[in-house]
From Swiss-Prot:
NCBIfam families given in the database record: trpD
Protein name: Anthranilate phosphoribosyltransferase
UniProt pathway: Amino-acid biosynthesis; L-tryptophan biosynthesis; L-tryptophan from chorismate: step 2/5
Organism, scientific name: Burkholderia ambifaria (strain ATCC BAA-244 / DSM 16087 / CCUG 44356 / LMG 19182 / AMMD)
Annotated SUPFAM superfamilies: Nucleoside phosphorylase/phosphoribosyltransferase catalytic domain, Nucleoside phosphorylase/phosphoribosyltransferase N-terminal domain
Gene designation per UniProt: trpD
Amino-acid positions noted as binding anthranilate 2 in the UniProt annotation, renumbered to this chain: R170
Length: 343
């Protein structure tokens, strides 16, 4: 039984759930551009007001994956995405992007899915661009990049063309909607493992259970209690972990790993150029908060990728990748590899 957009809107007004098959139908209408902008705006606002359920988010992510331009990766072992929802308002340098280079240097394969900054001063696409990486690759070129360098960056607009059908609505609404949390759930390379940062503590338990429904393998969803969508040095971090089909929720602290709790204030940047400088400083093994926080996040990603037995082991591997110069060398390797596809 399909549901009309009007019926769906009424359901959200009454704070009742839209069922899985109904949500699939509604999302397909939106992604095809077959729903009027007024109805699309009303429904996604209604969902936000009543609070989206795990089932609704999982169905929406399923459709977004259907409509994506996929990257076919042959070998799925130790394959991870490091991503944040963004929108945490912290304006820090690109910690997850720096972590990608370290994780790849330690043997993970990383499919990073990102965009230019919307809420942040520098999105992952902005800082990679500033580093000299060609971010505008076709899906087969991204697959080649992952196979060759252990890293691939998927520029969201190239992989989710159907999003243009809702872009104007989202821009005009100007508030967070379900689409703000779908990005990290819709990796076009289908990475089975993930380190996902979220902008609200409630999303830790929600997003990890959505990933469970979507068939992911090893996922850590994190929220720093100082408001960061990363594993934080400035506070405890809430973790939702999916492993072997089961979800566990717990808290970790920097001191658990022999790290000092320090404010993230010094990590703030104004633009992609400042982010680039801080990222390279951390990878060049310059002592400081930037190096420590990327070590912590890359270590967590290596645990998610099943290269490390624990976060603590991952941190040790991350330290070695930085100290040996391998992590810094990965930047030059990705620049060289992607520049050959410059159009």
């Amino acid at each position: 039984m399909t549901i009309t957009p009007q019926e769906a809107l009424q359901r959200t007004i009454e704070h009742r759930e839209i069922f899985h098959d109904e949500m699939l139908h509604l999302m397909r209408l939106i992604m095809r551009g077959d729903m009027s902008p007024v109805m699309a705006a009303a429904i996604i606002t209604g969902l936000r007001v009543k609070k989206e359920t795990i089932g609704e988010i999982a169905a929406a992510a399923t459709v977004m994956r259907e409509f994506a331009n996929h990257v076919e990766v042959q070998d799925n072992s130790n394959f991870v995405d490091i991503v944040g929802t963004g929108g945490d308002g912290s304006h820090t340098f690109n910690i997850s992007t720096a972590s990608m280079f370290i994780a790849a240097a330690a043997g993970a394969k990383v499919a990073k899915h990102g965009n230019r900054g919307v809420s942040s001063k520098s999105g992952s696409a902005d800082v990679l661009d500033a580093l000299g990486v060609n971010i505008d690759l076709q899906p087969d070129q991204v697959a080649a990049s992952i196979a060759e360098t252990g890293m691939g960056f998927m520029f969201a607009p190239n992989h989710h063309p159907a999003m243009k059908n809702i872009a104007a609505v989202r821009r005009e609404l100007g508030v967070r909607t379900i689409f703000n949390i779908l990005g990290p759930l819709t990796n076009p390379a289908g990475a089975p493992n993930q380190l996902m940062g979220v902008f609200h503590p409630d999303l830790v338990g929600i997003q990890v259970r959505v990933m469970q429904r979507l068939g992911a393998q090893h996922v850590l969803v994190v929220y720093g209690k100082d408001g960061m969508d990363e594993v934080s040095l400035g506070a405890a971090t809430l973790v939702g972990e999916l492993r072997d089909g089961k979800v566990h929720e717990y808290e970790i602290h920097p001191e658990d790993f022999g790290l000092q709790m320090v404010s993230n204030r010094t990590l703030k940047v104004e633009n992609a150029e400042e982010s680039r400088t801080m990222l390279l400083g951390a990878l060049d093994n310059q002592p400081g908060v930037a190096r420590e926080i990327v070590t912590l996040n890359a270590g967590t990603a290596l645990y998610a990728a099943n290269i490390a037995e624990s976060i603590a082991d991952g941190i040790q591997l991350a330290r070695e990748a930085i100290a040996s110069g391998k992590a810094r060398a990965k930047v030059d390797e990705l620049v060289r590899f992607t520049q050959q596809f410059k159009r």
